[in-house]
Regions:
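Conserved cytochrome P450 K-helix/beta-meander segment immediately N-terminal to the heme-binding cysteine loop
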Residues: 432-462
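Hydrophobic, well-ordered secondary-structure elements that form the walls
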Residues: 397, 427, 450, 478, ...
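Cytochrome P450 heme-thiolate monooxygenase catalytic core
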Residues: 100-107, 142-340
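Cytochrome P450 heme-binding "Cys pocket" and the immediately downstream C-terminal segment
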Residues: 197-198, 351-354, 461, 467-468, ...
Length: 537
């Protein structure tokens, strides 16, 4: 019996030693990551510190401060790194690093979309189906884009602003956060589904306000699924959900809403199967829908089950299409809407800057100024894109008020790699953020100031411009950067041009605008901005 007790004691001691080594000595001393500076003393042993920082919505500022103290590569967890230098960013984001399970929260209808696809080959195959219709050259030359933009701007947006300054109503404040979220949704939804099958959020204030509440609930509920997925699944099985039921209901309603948009296209879907797309007005062309559906069908016919896309996409094309387009409409709305809100806020602080911008806009031929004796016209997209002041104020807003300022996680490859001077094993979560990159003082002197002049051609030499552009990361970089960046820039420039060719804006209530949320997405604290519009005579 004594021998048995001795054996049990030895086993217990060995187990204790193994645990101490595995979770204390190895991560702090022998792990390849042990050479990397720690953001906080506990990070080699536990994720608790970084989990709390994220839960408290302090990640961006906390990690930016850590990089300023410790350098460009910082350890923030037992198996997690944060990076803030261009060489490391190139290694990770241009090196084909996969996405971690963190992105699974962006799956829709149980199916990964292009954004949430973890493996590079699957992402690349999907990207090839639609990259052409999101290219700058396609967008600028598309008759459908021009026709859709004309209707959204002249038929929906500008009439709302005109009504806000009408004598019958008297000058009053307009919540432009809501207006911009509506306009950007209409732009992206109509580009995807066509004007006739897209949204009209600008014309339906009640529903868009309801939609924004649903979307807020969705965004506020992703923490546990992203950071503690296994615990979250276990708690659901035990009937102890970590996410509130109202968030699940909001997600369900949003999913049903997008499914309804796709269902309206079913007749078109069938006609595509027959290779006979229905005729219609130019503005009714469903550009992204056509490219995605036809591309998936061709891949299914040509490759079938052997395709890298078969398990998640080709095996159920309808679910795959709905998942992809759900991601496009939500991301396309929010990011551009946030930038427009912050840009109009910055412009409204300087009437003189608005006058300069208007002079530049009215020099376009044709321009977007409304006149009683002429039909509203759309500017030449290429000429609009080249306007230096318009480009400068937009770029500076994207820099200082990036709509996605938070970390963009990747995973080191199975065989490990080198990140700067350090060796990293496989499976390490690693990320950069626009928040930190956009505050590099070498590229952006006085980075906390909104200074649009830094982007003007006359204010920098070629090397300074190249440096600034290399550090600009509002759309990420590499093969998995934002596919909709060209569309977003095009629509934002059009919307700003339409407004400031005809109106001067003044701040009425900007409470909370200074406090941009500290997380993956950067929203104004109150999610509202009230401006007064004054018609230019």
């Amino acid at each position: 019996m004594a021998h048995l007790d001795d054996w049990a004691g030895a086993v217990a001691l060995a187990f204790f030693v193994v645990v101490i080594y595995q979770y204390t000595i190895y991560p702090a001393v022998f792990s390849p990551l042990a050479r990397i500076p720690n953001a906080q003393w506990s990070v080699p042993f536990s994720r608790i510190w970084i989990l709390w920082v994220r839960y408290a919505h302090r990640e961006n500022r906390t990690l930016h401060s850590a990089h300023r103290r410790l350098g460009p590569i910082v350890r923030i967890g037992p198996n997690e790194l944060s990076i803030s230098d261009l060489d490391s960013v190139r290694t990770v984001y241009q090196g084909g690093f996969g996405k971690p399970v963190w992105y699974s929260v962006f799956d829709n209808y149980g199916v990964p979309c292009m954004f949430s696809a973890r493996a590079g080959p699957e992402h690349l195959a999907r990207k090839r189906l639609i990259s052409n219709v999101y290219s700058k050259s396609y967008i600028q030359s598309s008759p459908a884009v021009g026709a859709q933009s004309h209707e959204i701007l002249y038929g929906r947006l500008l009439p709302i602003l005109k009504a806000s300054v009408s004598p019958s109503q008297g000058p009053h404040a307009t919540d432009v956060y809501s207006i911009f979220m509506a306009a950007t949704m209409d732009f992206i939804a109509c580009y995807i589904f066509g004007l006739g099958h897209g949204t009209n959020f600008l014309g339906d204030k009640a529903y868009r306000e309801h939609f924004l509440e649903l979307y807020k609930a969705r965004n506020d509920s992703g923490y546990y699924d992203q950071e503690l997925p296994q615990l979250t699944k276990l708690c659901r099985k035990l009937g102890i959900p970590l996410c509130p039921k109202w968030a699940d209901k909001a997600n369900l309603e949003l999913g049903e809403w997008c499914w309804g948009l796709c269902a309206k296209m079913e007749g078109y879907f069938d006609s595509v199967n027959d290779n006979e797309p229905p005729a219609g007005a130019v503005a009714d062309q469903s550009i992204v829908w056509d490219a995605l559906v036809q591309g998936l069908q061709h891949r299914s016919t040509d490759e079938g089950p052997s395709s890298v896309m078969f398990p998640n996409n080709l095996s159920n094309i309808r679910l795959s299409v709905a998942s992809e387009l759900f991601d496009h409409v939500l991301a396309g709305q929010e990011t551009a809407g946030l930038v427009l809100t912050y840009l109009s806020w910055r412009l409204s602080q300087s009437v003189d800057l608005q006058h300069q911008l208007r002079a530049e806009l009215l020099a376009l031929v044709p321009n977007m100024q409304l006149a009683h004796d002429s039909k509203p016209a759309m500017p030449n997209p290429k000429q609009l894109d080249k306007l230096p002041l318009l480009h400068a104020v937009l770029m500076e807003t994207l820099r200082l008020h990036a709509p996605i300022p938070g970390a963009q996680p990747r995973e080191t490859p199975e065989g490990g790699c080198r990140i700067g001077p350090y060796a990293a094993p496989g499976g390490v979560r690693i990320a950069a953020s626009a928040y930190t990159l956009h505050r590099d003082e070498g590229a952006f002197p006085k980075p906390e100031e909104w200074d649009y002049t830094r982007w003007l051609p006359s204010n920098a030499n070629d090397e300074e411009r190249r440096t600034r552009n290399r550090w600009f990361w509002a759309f990420s970089s590499g093969g998995r950067m934002c596919i909709g960046s060209n569309f977003a820039i095009h629509e934002m420039k059009l919307i700003i041009a339409a407004i400031y060719s005809n109106y001067t804006t003044h701040i009425v209530d900007d409470e909370g605008m200074e406090n941009q949320s500290d997380g993956y997405t950067g929203r104004p604290e109150k999610e509202r901005l009230f401006l007064r519009f004054e018609k230019v005579l």
